[in-house]
Amino acid sequence: MNSTQKKLSYQIGLGILFLTFFITTTAQTKAINKFYLHAGAGWGTYESGLFDLGVQAIIKNKWSATLSYQSLTMRPKNRPADYQPETGYVLFIPYTYEVEANMTITSLTAGRYFKLGKNTWATTEGGLSYVSGDKVNFERTEVTSGNIIIAASTTSNYQTTKETKSSVGVAMRADLNWGFASFMGLGCGVFTNINSIQSPIGFQVKLIVGKMGREKKNKHKTEGL
């Protein structure tokens, strides 16, 4: 990581600490209209699967801020077109081993809040991320096979090595949420992260738990004349 990336990473860390402190100290005030944790899962480009955990605050019914952590497993972006995975069986149970690239993304984003209905809302945000992920190197090699009656294997036609790289990325996300209870809701959203390691685009669904800021039902009273 070069000095610029280290500086940006330090700034992101300070931003995360500030946001956490701000949300913790003001969550009970009128400035924070909604405050909730979210946990989600989804999929995206590069045949990726992902898990997302974070916290989001809606401020003054106008702004939103999110601190999130994502863990992704993906097909390496530089995987050769003729790549063949290792295959075989053990105790007559077949298996396939494909090399994967793992990535973690810690993001601090902020943006706008849009009220869509009584208890539905959307957010659009952008910000910076600290990204750590695998860079996979492929080297062509000879395919070999072997078996011992109850087990057999055929190696891949590429030998692989992994390096862990770090980068600063640009994060963008848009989410749609529905608070079906005062403390719980559901959501879905899309995201992307542009960085020098591998830039995924994905979709996720999530469960949200916290202060939903649901509107109370209006009770009409009829007064006799």
Regions found by a protein language model. Name each.
Residues 44, 57-59, 98-225:
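Outer-membrane beta-barrel transmembrane domain signature
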Residues 26-73, 77-79, 208-216, 225:
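Short glycine/proline- and aromatic-enriched beta-strand/turn motifs that initiate or cap beta-hairpins
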Residues 6-7, 21-26, 84-92, 160-162, ...:
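Intrinsic low-complexity, intrinsically disordered segments enriched in polar/basic residues
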Residues 29-36, 84-92, 149-156, 180-186:
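Flexible, solvent-exposed coil segments and beta strand-coil junctions
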Residues 73-109, 132-134:
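Surface-exposed acidic loop/strand-edge motifs in secreted or periplasmic proteins
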Residues 1-32:
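Bacterial Sec-dependent N-terminal signal peptides
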Residues 3-6, 11, 37, 84, ...:
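Compositionally biased, intrinsically disordered low-complexity regions enriched in proline and serine
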